[in-house]
Design a protein with these regions (language model features):
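Active-site glycine/GP-rich loop and adjacent strand/helix microenvironment
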Residues: 1-194
Length: 194
């Protein structure tokens, strides 16, 4: 991996934070990704964790992109939409059609039109991530699919894995289907995973 000094960093780019001794004798990866918001003085925000990403097809989707796309879609709705919890996983081998990203969302107040809402999120994702855009336009992936999780579905999921509590959080994105396969049993009846 390429190492950057503070003088080389650019604003708005994700970097992995490495702690080092002044002489560089050892380095430690703390697992966070950061973005610089200012260079004079240097200011950063934590933009995610390096283990939380989706890249099943080379798209390199990170948590901050997913959260921002979802926030944009919610803000663009004419009616109030509130989301209790969500996670995203790749669907690599669907029964029919191209693979896609599968969004499991538990709504307190769902959107009026779930398909339109999904298209808004997908368009925001394409605008945020050029690799995702290339895979959609190149017909390697189809646009994302939303699965509505029943009320308390995520809470029940966390309880079944023994991690219910304030310090435990559902990962926003995962590069595998471990969480998704369990959440399928907590879907609203109108969902039909394919």
């Amino acid at each position: 991996p390429q190492i950057h000094t503070l003088e080389e960093v650019e604003l708005g780019i994700n970097y992995v934070l490495i702690i080092s001794t002044t002489a560089g004798l050892w380095r430690y990866n703390i697992g966070d990704t950061i973005q610089f918001t200012s260079r004079f003085p240097f200011k950063v925000i934590v933009s995610g964790r390096i283990k939380h990403f989706i890249s099943a097809f080379g798209e390199h989707v990170i948590v901050s992109e997913v959260e921002q796309a979802l926030q944009q879609a919610v803000a663009s709705e004419r009616t109030e939409v509130t989301i209790r919890e969500f996670t995203v996983a790749p669907q690599v081998k669907p029964n029919t059609g191209l693979p896609y990203h599968e969004w499991f969302i538990e709504f307190d107040q769902p959107p009026a039109d779930l398909n339109t809402f999904a298209l808004k999120i997908d368009q925001a994702m394409q605008n945020k991530n050029i690799y995702y855009n290339d895979l959609i336009t190149g017909k390697v992936l189809r646009p994302l699919v939303i699965r509505m999780v029943a009320k308390d579905g995520f809470k029940n999921y966390m309880k079944t894995i023994g991690k219910l509590g304030g310090q435990n959080k559902v990962p926003r994105v995962s590069d595998n289907r471990k969480i998704a396969e369990v959440l399928i049993s907590y879907l609203e009846p109108l969902n039909d995973p394919k």
